[in-house]
Amino acid sequence: MSYPPERIVCLTEETVETLYLLGEQQRIVGVSGYAVRPPEVRRDKPRVSAFVSADVPKIMALRPDLVLTFSDLQADIVRDLVKSGIAVHAFNQRDIAGILAMIRMLGALVGCPDRASALADSLARRLDDARETTVGARRRPRVYFEEWDEPMICGIRWVSELIDIAGGIDVFADRARAPAATGRILAADDVIAAAPDVIVGSWCGKKFVPARVAARPGFAGVPAVQRQALYEIKSPIILQPGPAALTDGLDRLRTIIATCH
């Protein structure tokens, strides 16, 4: 691996967006098929992977000196790349602090630590400003965030933290801290008992269908269903642990939660 790396393959969205924001996009030679931020990435960079699968021969043909991955879900891809002699850095950020640390670490990896620190600091200030607007709110709506529908899976930790910053109460904040998605699987009775005022869906790449949620057995009595407060947030702006979640994702949450005041 050369330093700083000149040919980077990004197998998740957030490192792509971060490198563009740092002005280091010229280093990217391949991206995840889910990468959509900024829009030009779909035109300019070859796609080499889904999330849990990748075209390793295609990656190898790009002659990367560094591949960036995320979480244990890409462990098999990492194994194959390492066995092929490729340098890999696996990120595993699960909360806001981890997202900001990822930005700083990625900046260090590509030789622009000062720019990365400035970006992370500006995002942290933005979060603080948003938090200030909800401090002391007389009412904080109860929010159920659904990341997947079959089985029902509630939001991961950074989403839970963003709900709090946006002025809501995550009804499954305790589950959000689970180390794996299996710890966030819910039964319908869990949601019914939690009585959320708002349901926010982001079904990880497929369209959220409020009518399908409202029609679940027992959901007719859920406050969010009674007042038709079911909303979608597109996955690219909330489920990738990077700048998008801390900006557009947070803004969308704030707009949704504000409707319940």
Question: Model regions: which residues?
Answer:
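N-terminal ligand-binding lobe of clamshell/alpha-beta domains
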Residues: 1-261
